[in-house]
Amino acid sequence: MDVAVWNSIFVAVIYFLYFAVILTTIFVVILDNRSPVKTMAWILVLFFLPVAGWILYLFFGRSTRKERLISRKGYARLSKRPMAAYQEQPSVMAEHGKQRLMDFFSRVNNALPFSGNRVTVYTDAVSMLSDLLKDIYRARHHIHLEFYIFEDDAVGRLVRDALIDRARDGVKIRVLYDDVGCWKVPHDFYEQMLCEGIEVLSFLKVRFPRFTSKVNYRNHRKIVVIDGCVGFIGGMNLAERYVKGLGKGNWRDTHVRLEGKVVYGLQTAFLTDWYAIDRTLLTSAEYFPPISVKGGVLGQSVTSDPVGEWRDIMQGLMMAICSARRYFYVQTPYFLPNEEVMTALQTVALAGVDVRLMLPKRGDTWLIHKGSLSYLSEMMKAGVKIYLYKKGFLHSKLMVCDDELSTVGSTNMDFRSFEHNFEANAFFYDKETAMTLKEIFLADQKDCFLLSARIWEKRSWKNKITESVVRLLAPLL
């Protein structure tokens, strides 16, 4: 045979192998039994972007929901002390129909509800950082920090230097940061902490050539635990932009400081994540000390992750939506809901519940913002009121319902938070916290404009087409 024939055979074999790999991958996607929307999204990517699509699926598409970060036996040891404290307290009951939500989290997430907590709410990073630094300098035994972003800038260095000061005083400090969220941060930034005896770990490290499908599963939590009795949780990372904002306008976010046994849940979340990376199980009594705070808040610290059997926070939010009788207000920077959440919001709005959704007028990510806008027509058609925040960038993840239920945390209303990220939220079942967060929402509403369905439908066809195309990829963003 001449060279041309051999070349033709070689090309044919390459094409055959290539299409065999693509078809096999599509077959695997179908067998994974995900939601039809997500399955079709991956099939479209593999079909129209065959080479790039296969690579994207290899790193971002494979499911890890059947894996476990920690054995059941290990988790039982870790939760032994919080469980003892939970059993010692009088029976706790939430108001009206919110009890079912609390029971759901207790059973599915092992999120134990505790009464008698105190909650401080922050709507700006300056106030939160001020109190965080005060608590760091008050620490006597340990400080645990877990952040998606811990930048090497003025804010990050301020917190790092405070941690170093306390480490020199003998306080045990552990820092856990997400490897992708902090990929721009030079190693020297963390090396300075390591040299001072601070334990620092990166979550699910991503290094070439050791890429794995876990590059898609990031730790989006923002948790601080100090001496086992004070905690911080919310939407704020440790970075200067959370203080100064992005370009024009401020950065609007929500964070909370917790005092009381509800902090046990944050501690359990941190120690579980620490074990997942370091394989060291920390269960000593000093991490779950006796707490005698006199507060009036009933709360739960709830987590979700891509390796558990259920999508805990997403399912809890659906229950919260469906329990609404008078109103349901939510703030989120990204709105790419799955079918279940979108239908729940539409259904209660159609039933006469006052549903309000607040989003930033300008997003920080073009693709995700365009995808978010594609859902607004359907929401308004069902009677959901859409408020676009125009004073700056709204990064707050806040929900309040019926003056009885509220939550603050790291979870966005999008596929990524619901299915791919490690997230954490604090849920509160008292009127005072709900009213505080409701007042914050209504104050922010003054810096928004109410979107009109009539005006919204007049936007250009170019925008409509762009939004619709991006929406096809929503399950993958």
Where on the chain are the PLM-derived regions?
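N-terminal localization/anchoring segments of enzymes in phospholipid and broader phosphate metabolism
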Residues: 1-315, 319, 323, 347, ...
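Phosphate-/nucleic-acid-contacting segments
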Residues: 327
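Helical hairpin unit composed of two closely spaced alpha helices linked by a short loop
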Residues: 334-356, 360, 365-367
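Short, glycine/polar-rich helix-capping loops at beta-to-alpha or helix-loop-helix junctions
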Residues: 372-375
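Active-site donor-binding acidic/aromatic loop of nucleotide-activated sugar
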Residues: 386-390
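Catalytic-core elements of nucleic-acid end-processing and repair enzymes
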Residues: 397
